[in-house]
Amino acid sequence: MENFKHLPEPFRIRVIEPVKRTTREYREQAILKSGMNPFLLDSEDIFIDLLTDSGTGAVTQDMQAAMLRGDEAYSGSRSYYALAKAVKDIFGYEYTIPTHQGRGAEQIYIPVLIAKREREKGLDRSKMVVFSNYFFDTTQGHSQINGATVRNVYIKEAFDTTAKHPFKGNFDLEKLEKGIQEAGAHNVPYIVCTITCNSAGGQPVSIANLKGMYEIARKYDIPVIMDSARFAENAYFVQQREEAYKDWTIEQITYESYRYADGLAMSAKKDAMVPMGGILAFKDKSMEEVYHECRTLCVVQEGFPTYGGLEGGAMERLAVGLHDGMRQEWLAYRIAQIEYLVAGLEKIGVLCQQPGGHAAFVDAGKLLPHIPADQFPAQALSCELYKVAGIRAVEIGSFLLGRDPKTGKQLPCPAELLRLTVPRATYTQTHMDFIIEAFQKVKENAENIKGLTFTYEPKVLRHFTARLKEVE
């Protein structure tokens, strides 16, 4: 299939879900009813749903067939061992705990690692700091609930939508080490490496950067947890952009990447392609004590450690999905789809972050310069996009970042982005063209879009359930 300008989707569509079309008047009422928060819209009122790629895409025929092998035994399920083998083969990690999704893993490992640091190194909880290239929202939330101050240490190009860099997800290694020294290594219970880096625009982390980060972590005896939702997309970018790995397979790059962490926490609803599921895993004997403590906590919060909130069939499906999500031709198609969408948006003058792995990230701050950050320009843009075309997207900016839990002040956000998250094997090029046309209509009315203010603001992870209104 060489020498074609565009290749079609590398799959056949066998099952479809009808969607309804609505009127502008209907959508205006729906978004008002939802408190100007697209999270609170009913899915049946969405024409194209770009809220998330988490569990919203298609599954492969092999994944669906695998569910028939499910062993629903309460303990010792053979389906658990199928999943554990997949984790061992792909990542090289010895100890696996299934969870219902990624945040299930976070609520287990975070308090365990904090308690371990306190017990062994004398951690002072009032001075506790944790570091990441950029924390995902639930990882940040669980860290803060457990009393930690979160620090994101990213490179200067990360949020500059006018800058090009092959690995915008990279840690700023100098800032990382300086931050550890300032906090005191004993007060740093873990480092989280997010691949790809969602908040920066689905941007990858290079293996060279992973090595440097892990060297610093080893120097100060701090465990590293890989936030692994989009591990396969990260491996694809490494293959395409990091010279030393251009001839490596996705499988080889993935295995190599995970040498530079001590554990992984995964929402398997992204690159592993399942509707529900997560994984917590640890590398080797050095993390055996942590593994056993996490197993104990799993019983209380998720379920027995050999099912962790998942039925046997779901574990079988996940074991297959981990492999299916790493297919070379699949990843090439997926990244090309994002590149097509970004190119189309920029052609009509809508500035985006350079194409990442799972979404197009529109620079709402540039498109709506008249709306200040504390009136959430990306959230306002999301509401307008829904009114115009029935498209649901998600804000990645000040609204999501939230307030400092100690001072109550809005945290400064490096960019105000609107994420157009593309579910896997769900939408075609025609959908991408429709999205681009919708933005053309939004852009024509951009100066009339109003900022937003709260009518209800939760204290934690406010973006999920907050309600807002337009600023008069």
Swiss-Prot record:
Pathway: Amino-acid degradation; L-tryptophan degradation via pyruvate pathway; indole and pyruvate from L-tryptophan: step 1/1
Recorded GO MF terms: tryptophanase activity
Reactions this protein catalyses: L-tryptophan + H2O = indole + pyruvate + NH4(+)
Disulfide topology: none
Enzyme class, spelled out: lyase
Domain of life of the native organism: Bacteria
Entry keyword annotation includes Transport: no
Pfam families found in the cross-reference section: Beta_elim_lyase
Cofactor (UniProt): pyridoxal 5'-phosphate
Signal peptide (UniProt feature, chain positions): none
Subunit structure: Homotetramer.
Official protein name in the record: Tryptophanase
